[in-house]
Design a protein with these regions (language model features):
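Short helix- or helix-capping micro-motifs
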Residues: 1
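Active-site-proximal cofactor/substrate-binding loop regions of enzyme domains
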Residues: 4
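A short acidic, helix-capping loop that chelates divalent metal ions and anchors anionic groups
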Residues: 7
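Penicillin-recognizing serine hydrolase domain
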Residues: 11-164
Length: 164
């Protein structure tokens, strides 16, 4: 993700990225996120004053799980866009995390949705949710993984541990 979509969205919704970030910070307060939570940009790219805790990420995912449109996006493994004048074949988007986690032992947990991210300061990060074999909803947030595959293994290990 090159963040072009969120930049276009921020301009459409608020007129500018800065105004959109103001809405993001307002919403963070309304959601009861930590006092440390502060957005400096809409993309999530590193900025020295851009802060979020692991708990904040979990709270955002928990709220996203309740939103039908967000659920649909976060649960989609593959999406094929229709052709456009710039991409005659359309574009294909793939959530590699959702595909890769299926190759791991997650203790019988069915991982349903995930959002991955990377910035050099926090390495590979994932927030995901799934349903344990006992029917319990689980939400896992990890950061600091050294590679995309390590992030998958870290998540699978935690799902396995907490699904029992």
């Amino acid at each position: 993700s090159g963040a072009d979509a969120v930049l276009a969205l921020s301009k459409e919704v608020s007129g500018s990225e800065a105004a959109f970030v103001g809405l993001m910070n307002k919403r963070a307060k309304e959601m009861g996120l930590s006092s440390q939570c502060y957005f400096q940009n809409a993309t999530g790219l590193y900025h020295s004053t851009h802060h979020m805790t692991v708990k904040d990420m979990g709270q955002i995912m928990a709220l996203a799980m309740q939103n039908p449109a967000a659920r649909e996006v976060l649960m989609t493994e593959n999406y094929q866009m229709s052709p456009t004048n710039k991409h005659a074949q359309g574009l294909k988007f793939t959530n590699l995390f959702l595909q890769r986690i299926k190759t791991q032992d997650s203790g019988g947990t069915r991982i349903e949705m995930a959002k991955t991210g990377f910035v050099s300061q926090s390495k590979f990060c994932v927030v995901s949710s799934g349903k344990g074999k006992n029917g319990r909803n689980l939400l896992v947030v990890t950061g600091g993984s050294s590679s995309t595959w390590q992030a998958v293994r870290d998540q699978a290990t935690l799902y396995k541990l907490f699904s029992e």
